[in-house]
Amino acid sequence: MSNCFFDVIANGQPLGRIVFKLFDDVVPKTAANFRALCTGEKGYGYAGSTFHRVIPQFMLQGGDFTRGNGTGGKSIYGEKFPDENFALKHNKPGLLSMANAGPNTNGSQFFITTVVTPWLDGKHVVFGEVTEGMDVVKKVESLGSNSGATRARIVIDKCGTV
């Protein structure tokens, strides 16, 4: 199992670190994409990108490092890659799952659940979970709104593997 981290800031102020365990054994291709985007080893990735959509009692979405508004991003396999499988369910808060625009449109955008979200099962690939820093997830969640607009610029300041 790989572990990755995000050091998160809001309007330039540190919020703390989120650590993720990736489910390499179940979704190796999806996990490898996220890990490489955390390390920046391909020359691009999550460092400096924002959580552009945050909905309290639902999720935090980020990973659009090309446009910053939810319309961009790219994977290490090209712009998009197929859904690997739907073996893991959205059955608890703190899960890491791929955001998409329909079947087989995974790129770099991801979301972190803050509640159980079973309606996403079979549509979004779960590939990891928060192991440390759920308090940081909650801080980010508190800066969101029902529309998803954020009340601060929430940035992944640093990221990588641990």
UniProtKB/Swiss-Prot annotation:
PPIase cyclophilin-type domain span: 5-161
Top-level enzyme category: isomerase
Record text on activity regulation: Binds cyclosporin A (CsA). CsA mediates some of its effects via an inhibitory action on PPIase.
Localization per Swiss-Prot or TrEMBL: Cytoplasm
PROSITE patterns in the cross-refs: CSA_PPIASE_1 (PS00170), CSA_PPIASE_2 (PS50072)
Protein transport is among the record's keywords: no
Organism encoding this protein: Schizosaccharomyces pombe (strain 972 / ATCC 24843)
Name used for this protein in its record: Peptidyl-prolyl cis-trans isomerase
Record-level GO BP terms: protein folding
Pfam family, one: Pro_isomerase
Keyword tags: Cytoplasm, Isomerase, Rotamase
Catalysis: reaction(s): [protein]-peptidylproline (omega=180) = [protein]-peptidylproline (omega=0)
Role description: PPIases accelerate the folding of proteins. It catalyzes the cis-trans isomerization of proline imidic peptide bonds in oligopeptides.
GO terms assigned for molecular function: cyclosporin A binding; peptidyl-prolyl cis-trans isomerase activity
GO cellular component: cytoplasm; cytosol; nucleus
EC number: 5.2.1.8
Membership in a protein family: Belongs to the cyclophilin-type PPIase family. PPIase A subfamily.
